[in-house]
Amino acid sequence: CKSGSMVTTIKDGKQVLTKIDGKYFMYWGEHAVYAATSDDLVNWTPILDEKNELATVIKPRPQYFDSALTECGPPAILTDKGIVLLYNGKNQTNDSKRDKRFTAGAYCAGQILTDPKEPMKVLQRLDVPFFRPMASFEKSGQYVDGTVFIEGLVFFKNKWYLYYGCADSQVSVAIYDPAKKTPGDQIPN
């Protein structure tokens, strides 16, 4: 599923699909993030709200890096603190609605933490992207506003490999080694 993020966990050093309350759980959506459950990974039932409409997990926020859209990225991960969902956020091009610290129209990566017992309940959401277009190859090509569009996440040999599209022109990988301290990105004011 291009815009779907099924919940996984780490088991014996590998990322595997896991169930939440006896069902597989998937976050999905290309403007806002919704959710669905399945017994068999083939047939999915969207989660609806009290009005019988799609229940929203997150949606775009004015004046934030994800002001134009929020779209699911790689598989979500069940941790001891909750479910971590990485997502793609697009900044508005309209100056009154966008986050002016980042390029208008840029795609950046955000993350939320949801309650593992209530996966629709957001416990935390980053107000700034954890990954944004900074390298020249992420800001040239077909999408010059800048794009890091995260799609794949692999846990391999105790490191995380995050595969992403760069300016809609190539694919790259960012590697995170939890054993090494790395300085954080200095977000502009």
Report each predicted region and the residues it spans.
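Beta-rich carbohydrate-recognition and catalytic domains
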Residues: 1-68, 77-143, 157-189
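Short glycine-rich, acidic/polar surface loops and turns
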Residues: 138-140, 148-152
